[in-house]
Amino acid sequence: MKYFVVALALVAAFACIAESKPAESEHELAEVEEENELADLEDAVWLEHLADLSDLEEARGFFGNTWKKIKGKADKIMLKKAVKIMVKKEGITKEEAQAKVDAMSKKQIRLYLLKYYGKKALQKASEKL
């Protein structure tokens, strides 16, 4: 269970990176240059390097693709978990449980798993008290 939580945290981190703000535009850098009255050539070179931040766009694309892969694998794991839980909880065959899960939307599957693991966590917490 804790591996699932860690994986979920990583997915959230990748999503935040993928949704992050794009690099500053040349126009914004020109405004900064005017505000700071940069006369020094080294400062101007530094600002040019800031304007050439295409690596951030490439990284964002990489994390976006990675996010999609992780999300796909997480969805497959959730489907398998939902089938296992239904077989155990309802006492039906694996094929029947698979048919029920296939009929459910991804949102319904997530809610089903959250309810199951929420009840399980509540029971463990009440036992410790």
From Swiss-Prot:
Which positions carry the signal peptide feature in this UniProt record? 1-20
Keywords in UniProt for this one?
Antibiotic, Antimicrobial, Cytolysis, Hemolysis, Secreted, Signal, Toxin
What does its PTM field state?
A: Cleavage of the propeptide depends on the processing quadruplet motif (XXXR, with at least one of X being E).
Give the UniProt subcellular location, in the record's own words.
Secreted
Output the superkingdom of the source species: Eukaryota
Membrane-traversing stretches = none
- Pro-sequence positions in this chain? 21-60
UniProt tissue specificity:
Expressed by the venom gland.
Pfam families noted in UniProt: Latarcin (PF10279)
Please tell me one Gene Ontology term that the record gives under cellular component.
Answer: extracellular region
GO terms of molecular function: toxin activity
Which BP terms in the Gene Ontology apply to this protein? defense response to Gram-negative bacterium; defense response to Gram-positive bacterium; killing of cells of another organism
Where does this chain carry the motif Processing quadruplet motif?
A: 57-60
What does the comment on domains in this protein's record state? Both the N-terminus (61-94) and the C-terminus (99-129) of the mature peptide form alpha-helices which probably disrupt target cell membranes. The linker region (95-98) probably derives from a processing quadruplet motif (PQM), found in propeptides of many zodatoxins, hinting at a fusion of two originally separate membrane-active peptides.
Return the similarity comment. Answer: Belongs to the cationic peptide 06 (cytoinsectotoxin) family.
Purpose of the protein: Insecticidal, cytolytic and antimicrobial peptide. Forms voltage-dependent, ion-permeable channels in membranes. At high concentration causes cell membrane lysis.
UniProt-recorded name of the protein: M-zodatoxin-Lt8d
Give the originating organism. Answer: Lachesana tarabaevi (Spider)
Which gene produces this protein? cit 1-4
